[in-house]
Structure formats: structure tokens, C-alpha cells
């Protein structure tokens, strides 16, 4: 490894010019200066690329049409590294634009990596809003439960987030490319890093290598207020974290052979239960509650109105002398509505 290796920063973006600009300003404060930004602009229409070039004129821009998503964008970055014949001893850093980091971020990453070969290092995260640690970037995926558990224990980790992932170019390319058609967005990072571990690379975290994350800029997760058709469509959207097609492909690609069929059966049982049974009951329950509340309002209103009608108008006039002012106003309101 050279004494001052170059870091190639792969940054997928789409129509977040202000957020991307803030990232570039953060990047320009780095104490380590030997880096090159590869901006993968997937069809932005808000002048993101032009703004980045104003701030960082020597950046490389790869332009897409809006259909690459995360996995496809990283595949474009992968292709660029191969085409440019970037030296294997240099480094590649995958980043999200909705992150912030200290001025020694790049320097800290290189310092950690110089003692670790055949390694993928991912930045641990903290919440930009609260300032508290959140999402360590390292996970233990349990096939039995189909759940990805967060963990700081390197011995337990079997996959990583690629948000803030650092590796030598040689190690990064040795894993192979991504699967943008099979896993276009969510799960692409888990699949890639699982494959890396299977090929002998170490998955690593370090407390000195950290980023602040804006967790409000994530994909479709709250589907509770949607109609049933909207709910179905959003579940199958590429932005949906629980997209069943992406999950199926993920299981086929990375699940151990001996439990693959069983896991697929279990997964689709859960999917069908969630999409067609639980959600249907939820919608029925929601409509029942709304209709019940509406019915109660109608009944109460009817009883009140009928109650006022049962009081003779003459008696209402005599009551005015003894009824408190507040009640008189309410009685007058009812009287006006009835008559």
C-alpha cells in the first residue's frame, strides 16, 4: 500500500440537491485530501450534478435516467472502477449523501484499515437529530427468524450496511458486482457484504469511524394509513424495505442451501398473511370503528334534537328565567336549529 492512497468516494444521489451540497461541504473539510468523488446521479432534475461541480470541479459525474436505485447506482460505480483501471491498493468508500462526519473521518478510516487486510469496514451511525448512537452498521441476519439484528460484536456480524463502507479497490472488486435487477434497493448491501464474508473477507466496525445519519430520509415503511390497493402497491415498490420480490431474490441468492426451500415457504406464508389477512382485518376494523363513531354521532344528535322538541315552547320561555346564562345560550342554539 502506498503512503498516501487515493480514496474513490462512490456517492449515489437523486434529486436532493441541498442535502448533497451539504455532504460536499462536509467532504471539503477533510484533513485527508487525496480523494476523488464519483457522483452517481440517477436522473436528478434539480441541478444536483451542476451544483456539485460548482463546489468540487474535479468530481466525476455518472448520469442515469432514474431507474438505477441504490444497487444499480453502486453497480455503475463498480463498472467505473473497472473501466478506469483504478489501482487495487487504492480505496473505495461508499457513502449516502444524507450523512455528516467529522473532519478526520477519511483519515481515521485509513488509519484503521492499514492494519487490516481483506476487510470491509463500515462506519457506525448516530442520529443527527438526537445525537444518540443509532444503527451500528453491523448486523447478524438470522435466517430462522428472517430478522436482521443490529450488533456491535464483530464475531456475530454476517452482513454490513454499505452506508459508509470502506475497502481497498481490490477487495471491493473481488466480491463481484451487485444485482440491480434482482435486488435494486434495500437488501443489496446485505447481499453484497454476506457474499464478501463467504469469499473470505472480514466484516468490521470501529468506534473511531462514525457518521451522523438523517433517519427521516428513509424509504416507505409506514403504510398504516393507506387504502388496500395503495398498501399493496407500496409494498411492491422498489423503495419499500419489505418488498417481497427483493426479499425472495435475496433468500435465493444468500440463504444456505439446506434451508432455502423451507425459508422461502416460511417467508411467503408471512407475506400472504400480512398482505391479505392481517391487513384485511385491519381495514375492516378501521372501517367498523369509523362507521360506528359516525353512527353514534348521528344517534346522539337525533336524541338531543328530539329532546328539545319534546319541551313545549311555552315551558322553554318560563325556563329562561331560571336557567343559567350558559344553558340558555345552548337552549337557544337548539331552538334555532329545530325551528
Model segments located where?
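Non-catalytic, C-terminal membrane-associated alpha-helical segments of glycosyltransferases
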Residues: 225-339
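A recurrent flexible, glycine/aromatic-enriched loop bordering the glycosyltransferase active site
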Residues: 147-167, 233-237
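Conserved donor NDP-sugar-binding/catalytic core segment of glycosyltransferases
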Residues: 100-136
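Short beta-strand-to-loop acidic/aromatic patch adjacent to the donor-nucleotide binding site
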Residues: 87-100
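A short, conserved alpha-helix in the catalytic core of glycosyltransferases
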Residues: 165-167, 171-176, 182-209
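A conserved acidic beta->alpha catalytic loop
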Residues: 41-50
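Short, acidic, metal-binding catalytic loop of nucleotide-sugar glycosyltransferases
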Residues: 25-34
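Glycine-rich, basic loop-to-helix element that forms the pyrophosphate-binding segment
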Residues: 64-84
Amino acid at each position: 500500500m502506498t503512503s498516501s492512497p487515493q480514496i474513490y468516494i462512490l456517492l449515489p444521489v437523486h434529486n436532493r440537491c441541498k442535502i448533497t451540497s451539504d455532504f460536499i461541504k462536509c467532504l471539503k473539510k477533510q484533513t485527508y485530501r487525496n480523494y476523488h468523488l464519483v457522483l452517481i446521479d440517477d436522473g436528478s432534475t434539480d441541478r444536483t450534478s451542476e451544483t456539485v461541480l460548482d463546489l468540487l470541479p474535479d468530481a466525476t459525474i455518472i448520469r442515469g435516467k432514474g431507474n438505477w436505485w441504490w444497487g444499480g447506482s453502486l453497480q455503475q460505480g463498480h463498472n467505473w472502477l473497472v473501466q478506469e483501471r483504478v489501482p487495487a491498493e487504492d480505496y473505495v468508500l461508499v457513502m449516502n449523501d444524507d450523512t455528516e462526519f467529522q473532519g478526520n473521518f477519511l483519515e481515521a478510516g485509513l488509519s484503521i484499515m492499514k492494519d487490516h487486510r481483506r476487510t470491509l469496514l463500515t462506519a457506525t451511525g448516530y442520529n443527527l437529530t438526537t445525537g444518540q448512537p443509532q444503527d451500528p452498521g453491523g448486523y447478524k441476519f438470522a435466517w430462522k427468524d428472517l430478522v436482521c439484528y443490529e450488533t456491535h460484536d464483530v464475531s456475530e456480524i454476517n452482513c454490513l450496511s454499505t452506508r459508509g463502507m470502506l475497502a481497498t479497490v481490490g477487495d471491493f472488486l473481488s466480491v463481484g458486482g451487485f444485482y440491480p435487477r434482482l435486488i435494486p434497493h434495500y437488501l443489496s448491501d446485505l447481499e453484497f457484504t454476506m457474499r464478501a464474508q463467504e469469499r473470505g473477507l472480514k466484516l468490521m466496525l470501529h468506534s473511531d469511524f462514525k457518521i451522523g445519519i438523517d433517519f427521516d430520509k428513509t424509504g416507505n415503511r409506514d403504510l398504516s394509513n393507506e387504502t388496500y390497493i395503495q398498501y399493496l402497491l407500496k409494498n411492491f415498490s422498489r423503495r419499500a424495505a419489505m418488498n417481497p420480490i427483493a426479499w425472495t431474490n435475496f433468500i435465493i441468492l444468500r440463504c444456505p442451501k439446506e434451508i432455502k426451500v423451507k425459508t422461502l415457504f416460511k417467508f411467503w406464508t408471512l407475506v400472504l398473511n400480512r398482505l391479505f389477512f392481517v391487513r384485511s382485518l385491519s381495514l375492516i376494523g378501521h372501517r367498523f370503528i369509523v362507521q360506528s363513531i359516525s353512527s353514534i354521532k348521528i344517534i346522539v344528535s337525533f336524541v338531543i334534537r328530539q329532546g328539545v322538541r319534546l319541551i313545549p315552547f311555552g315551558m322553554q320561555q318560563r325556563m329562561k328565567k331560571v336557567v343559567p346564562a350558559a344553558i340558555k345560550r345552548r337552549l337557544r342554539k337548539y331552538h334555532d336549529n329545530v325551528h
